[in-house]
Amino acid sequence: MVTIRLTRGGAKKRPFYQIVVADSRSPRDGRFIERIGFFNPLAAGQAERLRLDVAKVDAWVAKGADLSDRVASLVKEARKAA
């Protein structure tokens, strides 16, 4: 099964997440199919907090991909901002 989920990057105590399409059996930070955005929870000032290609999300969901709970809320936020 294919899922759209977050992979963690960044330094210790300074998380930065990539939003990726991955097989649900692969490790959290392992192999992925496509990178479709990023999420920076600690963005300050003019830094971009969320960038997400909503068209690609819609395309993958149409193909049967599931969204993780957190990604579903981020997609909702991205649609509201656009």
Swiss-Prot record:
A Gene Ontology term for the protein's cellular component: cytoplasm
Gene Ontology process terms (BP): translation
Keywords: Ribonucleoprotein, Ribosomal protein
Record field: transmembrane: none
SUPFAM superfamilies for the chain: Ribosomal protein S16
Pfam families for the chain: Ribosomal_S16
GO molecular-function terms, A-Z: structural constituent of ribosome
Gene3D superfamilies in alphabetical order: 3.30.1320.10
Entry-linked PROSITE patterns: RIBOSOMAL_S16 (PS00732)
InterPro entries in the cross-refs: Ribosomal_bS16 (IPR000307), Ribosomal_bS16_CS (IPR020592), Ribosomal_bS16_dom_sf (IPR023803)
Ligase as UniProt keyword: no
UniProt cross-references to PANTHER family, sorted A to Z: 30S RIBOSOMAL PROTEIN S16, SMALL RIBOSOMAL SUBUNIT PROTEIN BS16M
HAMAP family attached to this UniProt entry: Ribosomal_bS16
Similarity remark: Belongs to the bacterial ribosomal protein bS16 family.
The protein, known as: Small ribosomal subunit protein bS16
Native source species: Actinobacillus pleuropneumoniae serotype 5b (strain L20)
Gene name, Swiss-Prot/TrEMBL: rpsP
